[in-house]
């Protein structure tokens, strides 16, 4: 009887882990310079691994982050979310909508699809103390995010950055073409 009561007490005091859908893990940014390469098929909203962080400027005014989305070229990065708010970017990557744009140009996000001929991000190269022209990220899809410190804008810390992406291009034996597809059979065949 004592074992039964002890077992019941432990179960009652142990927090339960929500089972939820598998998608919940995709909407996070883990900090890891050695994260495994992820394959992305079809269209999905996802976060990524923060594989690079650097602070620059007087009193570390700017925070530079690389958020790796996939270990291959993506067909496209359609939209960007800060926390759960979809944002619009201008031609230079600065956020121009929502609360993230109210106090000036505090957030810049640049999209990199991971093409085989991808070159280093010119803004990151110019503003970083550590990045060289060898940092191309060829074959790696990522977001380069620069935050300008503002206590009012970032009162709750670094926000969550996610993107709606179109995944890996896959071969179709029926047409002998390699294109983006959300056809499950073609994606499984590619994997």
Predicted regions and their residues:
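Polar, S/T/G-rich
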Residues: 1-191
């Amino acid at each position: 009887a004592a074992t039964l009561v002890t077992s019941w007490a432990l179960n009652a005091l142990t927090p339960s882990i929500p089972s939820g859908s598998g998608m919940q893990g995709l909407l996070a940014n883990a900090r890891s310079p050695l994260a495994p390469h992820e394959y992305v098929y079809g269209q999905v909203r996802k976060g990524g691994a923060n594989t690079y962080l650097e602070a620059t400027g007087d009193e570390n005014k700017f925070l530079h982050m690389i958020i790796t989305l996939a270990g291959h070229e993506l067909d496209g990065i359609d939209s960007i979310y800060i926390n759960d708010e979809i944002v619009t970017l201008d031609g230079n990557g600065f956020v121009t909508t929502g609360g993230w744009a109210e106090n000036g140009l505090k957030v810049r996000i640049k999209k990199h699809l991971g093409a085989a001929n991808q070159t280093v991000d010119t803004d990151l190269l110019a503003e970083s103390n550590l990045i060289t022209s060898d940092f191309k990220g060829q074959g790696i899809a990522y977001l380069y995010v620069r935050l300008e410190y503002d206590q009012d804008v970032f009162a709750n810390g670094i926000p969550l950055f996610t993107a709606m992406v179109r995944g890996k291009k896959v071969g179709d034996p029926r047409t002998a073409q390699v294109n983006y597809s959300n056809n499950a059979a073609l994606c499984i065949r590619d994997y």
